[in-house]
């Protein structure tokens, strides 16, 4: 169970997007999969500033009442728990993997959005397989020869801002989808009265 979500393949090419582009990307996912279970797999740890993006997003989503969140500051989806959690993912669920990454200087503060999986801990040679139906990687800092140190010394302000942008995009898309669902149900019920 869940094994189909963790595969050893090269992820699809990701699009580099800002907060508005991320909003459009997430809205498409939610509208394309209306009625299906969507799990937001927020990968990372609360023990590294740069790598806390995923758990921060998970906590913000939980606070906003978004269902299907795995990985928060309280219960992170980190190197120790990811393999076990991946096995519990339902085979028919849509998985949106969310993680921090290092990248080019011009990409810092932006997001890599992909209609395919991401490889957790790639910049630090974590050895994980790809995971996710879709993925969002937040470029929290510039890639360097010392990725662990770079993640540790990443700006908390930047990480928190980016986590807020991801959570805002998801929460507002979920709310819009719910509103459309209730509106169409109300119209349908009104048509039968």
Where are the regions a protein language model picked out?
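N-terminal catalytic or cofactor-binding beta/alpha core of small enzyme domains
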Residues: 1-193
């Amino acid at each position: 169970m869940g094994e189909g979500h963790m595969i050893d393949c090269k992820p699809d090419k990701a699009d580099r997007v800002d907060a508005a582009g991320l909003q459009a990307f997430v809205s498409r996912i939610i509208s394309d999969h209306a009625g299906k279970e969507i799990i937001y797999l927020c990968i990372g740890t609360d023990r590294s500033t740069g790598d806390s993006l995923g758990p921060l997003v998970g906590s913000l989503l939980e606070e906003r009442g978004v269902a299907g969140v795995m990985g928060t500051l309280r219960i992170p989806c980190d190197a120790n728990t990811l393999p076990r959690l991946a096995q519990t993912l339902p085979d028919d669920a849509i998985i949106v993997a969310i993680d921090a990454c290092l990248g080019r200087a011009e990409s810092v503060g932006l997001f890599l959005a992909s209609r395919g999986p991401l490889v957790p801990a790639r910049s630090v040679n974590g050895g994980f397989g790809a995971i996710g139906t879709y993925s969002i990687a937040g470029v929290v800092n510039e890639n360097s020869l010392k990725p662990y140190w770079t993640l540790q010394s990443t700006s908390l302000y930047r990480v928190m801002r980016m986590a807020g942008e991801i959570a805002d995009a998801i929460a507002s898309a979920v709310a819009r989808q719910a509103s459309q669902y209730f509106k169409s149900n109300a119209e349908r019920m009104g048509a039968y009265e």
